[in-house]
Amino acid sequence: MLSPDVLKKLEAIEQRFEELTQLLSDPAVAGNGDRFRKVAKERASIEQTVTALRAYRKLLEDVEGNEALLADKDPELRELAKEELAQLRPQVEPAEEQLKLYLVPKDPNDEKDVIVEIRAGAGGDEAGLFAAEVMRMYVRYAERRGWRVELMDTSGGALGGVKEATLTVSGDAVYSSLKYESGVHRVQRVPATEAQGRIHTSTVTVAVMPEAEEIDVQVNPADVEMDVFRSTGSGGQSVNTTDSAVRLTHKPTGIVVKCQQEKSQLKNRTMAMKMLRAKLFEIEQERQRSARDATRKSQVGTGDRSEKIRTYNFPQDRLTDHRVNYTRHNLPAVMDGDVQDVIDACRTFYAAQALREASRGEAGAAERRA
């Protein structure tokens, strides 16, 4: 059974949901576009929790009703009740665990769009080929989710591979899903260039950064040095007759970003500034995380980039996420963007971990009060 404290928190969320529902029908709110969107967004953010709470209550009512029938004089009713309880009782504990997960504080960046950087690591040309496949995997996943993807910068490699690529992905709560992709992705397979049929291991690094607004990060124009140059294609050849590509250097940190995908220098500069703000925002986020808990090595919800988070084993048609001990097969589907189950496994694992840590914190606080 859920503890009284957990039930109290869930009931408070339900009460807030009812208040927000009433506000949406208030003419004063309906006539104010910004206020209406804010109320609707908050309501949508807790609707799933309220739906699960009400389904849980209904489940308990059904269990209680069928347990009462076990004492009925009619043997047929008793037998039916036993059959129902055999199906209902196993649903109670998973429903309770799910409700607890809904109480985990949300990452304030979850609603943000993201910038994804993909780089070929160890493995030469094979790493570049896999980097191109990983990039396509994210593009296909974004398409499945109805998100928008823009290629901001790319550096081509041999055989159609990619040395590095930068994408922006925008849509509904993009960071809440893609944040689990940060880290080193390892591939094991026989490369197309391997004549002996030997299995090689290559790596690709992925960095996912929440897109930062100007209100999140203030960049002093005097700290930014801008260079312009002609856009180049995958083979290094010039593909533009004007200096439309932009390179920005943030002098205090040494961060360098560039964008050459647009024909307009102004558009490239705008996109490059977006990349720079995201990198500076990530640095500040990392600083705050370290300050909160300098002893913890794991970075919940961000992914440690020095860690091999996932292995794609093609000879065995198997994907393994090492952080959450999750394994699945059918790599062709995975590389075509069918990765929602992997992301869900990561989300559930880290939410449960955060819930345990929060519970330990509350228990410690209770002991200190006692």
Curated annotation (Swiss-Prot):
Entry's localization field: Cytoplasm
Modified residues (N5-methylglutamine): 237
InterPro entries tied to this protein: PCRF, Pep_chain_release_fac_I, Pep_chain_release_fac_I_sf, Prokaryotic/Mito_RF, RF-1
GO cellular component, one term: cytoplasm
Predominant localisation class: cytoplasm
Family per similarity comment: Belongs to the prokaryotic/mitochondrial release factor family.
Bias (Basic and acidic residues): 286-296
Main function: Peptide chain release factor 1 directs the termination of translation in response to the peptide chain termination codons UAG and UAA.
PTM comment, free text: Methylated by PrmC. Methylation increases the termination efficiency of RF1.
Keywords: Cytoplasm, Methylation, Protein biosynthesis
Protein name: Peptide chain release factor 1
Gene3D superfamilies: 3.30.160.20, 3.30.70.1660, 6.10.140.1950
PANTHER family: LD18447P
